[in-house]
From Swiss-Prot:
Record carries keyword rRNA processing: no
Record-linked Gene3D superfamilies: Cholin Binding, Glycosidases, Multimodular pneumococcal cell wall endolysin, domain 3
Cell wall-binding repeats mapped onto the chain: 200-219, 220-239, 241-260, 261-280, 281-300, 303-322
Family matches, as SUPFAM superfamilies: (Trans)glycosidases, Cell wall binding repeat
Biological process annotations from GO: cell wall macromolecule catabolic process; defense response to bacterium; killing of cells of another organism; peptidoglycan catabolic process
Active site feature: D10, D92, E94
Protein name: Lysozyme
Family listed: Belongs to the glycosyl hydrolase 25 family.
Length: 339
């Protein structure tokens, strides 16, 4: 939990392996540490910087511009490399925008939604002029209220001079200086997390994780809701992880921490959509304002091809969305229909 007027620094490999000195200068141990950039770069100093500080979040430097599919790939790369549990994951969007502000906004929103779907609170970081020129930040706030972290330095003398505050709606944190390192102040209290109390304790042995209830029993061959999350335990009481489960003729997916997935999930190279009960959806899926099609055979999302549904043919874009104006070199047999 961070409160109004708390301070923190954000760090990357630029700050080196030893950040104890700048933490002491700042008078805090709070950090937001860079994890990744694009889909290949990882901060080589990450482990050391995490060990020396108290991370309140992590950030990813985006290179996806206005490409939603690339934003999804970058978000997944970011999520796959989060080293420890935190509340906030940050989209650092300050370079390589496309010339289309709406496309940029859509890509940012998709990235942030994947962060939210994974159980984190998404934050948008940039500076005011760049944001006003390239992103509709009000759309971001409509979906993720109070999610902005904005840089604005004024005299950049190391002090938080509110005469130079970059006034915008929805700012949670302000990066007020980069001299001699990035300095930040919290403007809004964290909301209290309402996490259900668990009625037992997680245990681990050489075979995996299991859950010991307070009365000494443990779940097996069943679903169990623990801390507001559903898990499935096998016949020996071990939690299933990173695998598909067929139960009552429906398919479910358990994440690497055992939690049942709802919403979108990337398994291997394929996207799937799970409903609110966790069951895999086939056929048409309406998500936000877009339509997607999941195959009846395997449930994977169709992309960059025509599909036949009912009496009509539909074209699904490379990001899986139903095309408004399908483009093709050879019209398939049958009627082309666009919803």
């Amino acid at each position: 939990m961070v409160k109004k007027n708390d301070l923190f620094i954000d760090v990357s490999s630029h700050n080196g392996y030893d950040i104890t000195g700048i933490l002491e200068q700042m008078g805090t141990t709070n950090t937001i540490v860079k994890i990744s950039e694009s889909t290949t770069y990882l901060n080589p100093c990450l482990s050391a910087q995490v060990e020396q500080s108290t991370p309140i979040g992590f950030y990813h430097f985006a290179r996806f511009g206005g490409d939603v599919a690339e934003a999804e790939r970058e978000a997944q790369f970011f999520l796959d490399n989060v080293p420890t549990q935190v509340k906030y994951l940050v989209l650092d969007y300050e370079d390589d925008p496309s010339g289309n502000a709406q496309a940029n906004t859509n890509a940012c929103l998709r990235f942030m939604q994947m962060i939210a779907d994974a159980g984190y609170t998404p934050i948008y970081y940039s500076y005011k002029p760049f944001t006003l020129d390239n992103v509709d930040y009000q759309q971001i706030l409509a979906q993720f209220p109070n999610s902005l972290w904005i840089a604005g330095y004024g005299l950049n003398d190391g002090n938080a001079d509110f005469e130079y505050f970059p006034s915008m709606d929805g700012i949670r944190w302000w990066q007020y200086s980069s001299n001699p390192f990035d300095k930040n102040i919290v403007l809004l209290d964290d909301e209290e997390d309402e996490k259900p109390k668990t009625a037992g304790t997680w245990k681990q042995d050489s075979k995996g994780w299991w859950f010991r209830r307070n009365n000494g029993s443990f779940p097996y061959n069943k679903w169990e809701k623990i801390g507001g999350v559903w898990y499935y335990f096998d016949s020996k009481g071990y939690c299933l992880t990173s695998e598909w489960l067929k139960d009552n003729e429906k398919w479910y997916y358990l994440k690497d921490n055992g939690a049942m997935v709802t919403g979108w999930v990337l398994v291997g190279s394929e996207w799937y959509y799970m409903d609110d009960s966790g069951a895999m959806v086939t056929g048409w899926v309406k998500y936000k304002n877009n339509w997607y099609y999941m195959t009846n055979e395997r449930g994977n999302m169709v992309s960059n091809e025509f599909i036949k549904s009912g009496k009509g043919w539909y074209f699904m874009n490379t990001n899986g969305e139903l095309a408004d104006n399908p483009s093709f070199t050879k019209e398939p047999d049958g009627l082309i229909t666009v919803a």
